[in-house]
Amino acid sequence: MSIILGIDPGSRITGYGVIRQVGRQLTYLGSGCIRTKVDDLPSRLKLIYAGVTEIITQFQPDYFAIEQVFMAKNADSALKLGQARGVAIVAAVNQELPVFEYAARQVKQTVVGIGSAEKSQVQHMVRTLLKLPANPQADAADALAIAITHCHVSQNAMQMSESRLNLARGRMR
């Protein structure tokens, strides 16, 4: 059993999603958004750090998965996004959580089956995969999708390792 915290970073809204994985079974534990209503960036970063730390304390995840930085049209926005990611990662590292990063395209490909999927498609598939009564808010859905991606990637990596081990054992006999 593993608990995975997914984070969709943003300097104004940071989405989070928490799921439990037992084998191939995924269970929704919680999701939401850390909203920073202050104007100055240092105060927003402090709120993100505190919010992520609180979520980690509440859910006690085993893994921390976060979206990688993408190239934004606006350099200032990209820098702020990078800083928001940074404080979220520091919150995880301070709690000794292993950190995994996934590209947005990989997350969409894993959850929807199309790397260029729309936000509404991600919301719908997250709702379906986690058997939720309604679509989660967009940023929370993205965070849940990141957590789901981590489950799929780690499950596939484990299966590949087992296959290689079995193959090696077969050669030794």
Swiss-Prot record:
Q: Which residues bind Mg(2+) 2?
A: E67
Give the top-rank taxon of the lineage listed in the UniProt record for this protein: Bacteria
One cellular component term (GO) for this entry is:
Holliday junction resolvase complex
Q: What class of enzyme is it?
A: hydrolase
One Pfam family, please name it: RuvC
Any idea which GO molecular function terms this record carries?
Answer: crossover junction DNA endonuclease activity; DNA binding; magnesium ion binding
Coarsely, its chief localization is: cytoplasm
Disulfide-bond pairs as recorded: none
List the cofactors: Mg(2+)
What catalytic reaction does the record list? Endonucleolytic cleavage at a junction such as a reciprocal single-stranded crossover between two homologous DNA duplexes (Holliday junction)
Q: Where is the active site?
A: D8, E67, D139
Q: Which residues bind Mg(2+) 1?
A: D8, D139
Q: Where in the cell is it found?
A: Cytoplasm
Q: What is its EC number?
A: 3.1.21.10
Record text on cofactor binding: Binds 2 Mg(2+) ion per subunit.
Q: Which UniProt keywords apply?
A: Cytoplasm, DNA damage, DNA recombination, DNA repair, DNA-binding, Endonuclease, Hydrolase, Magnesium, Metal-binding, Nuclease
**One biological process GO term for this chain?**
DNA recombination
Give the protein's function: The RuvA-RuvB-RuvC complex processes Holliday junction (HJ) DNA during genetic recombination and DNA repair. Endonuclease that resolves HJ intermediates. Cleaves cruciform DNA by making single-stranded nicks across the HJ at symmetrical positions within the homologous arms, yielding a 5'-phosphate and a 3'-hydroxyl group; requires a central core of homology in the junction. The consensus cleavage sequence is 5'-(A/T)TT(C/G)-3'. Cleavage occurs on the 3'-side of the TT dinucleotide at the point of strand exchange.
Q: Which NCBIfam families match?
A: PRK00039.2-1, ruvC
Q: Tell me which family the UniProt entry assigns to this protein.
A: Belongs to the RuvC family.
What does the record note on quaternary structure?
Answer: Homodimer which binds Holliday junction (HJ) DNA. The HJ becomes 2-fold symmetrical on binding to RuvC with unstacked arms; it has a different conformation from HJ DNA in complex with RuvA. In the full resolvosome a probable DNA-RuvA(4)-RuvB(12)-RuvC(2) complex forms which resolves the HJ.
By what name is this protein known?
Answer: Crossover junction endodeoxyribonuclease RuvC
Organism equals Salmonella paratyphi B (strain ATCC BAA-1250 / SPB7)
Q: Which gene encodes it?
A: ruvC
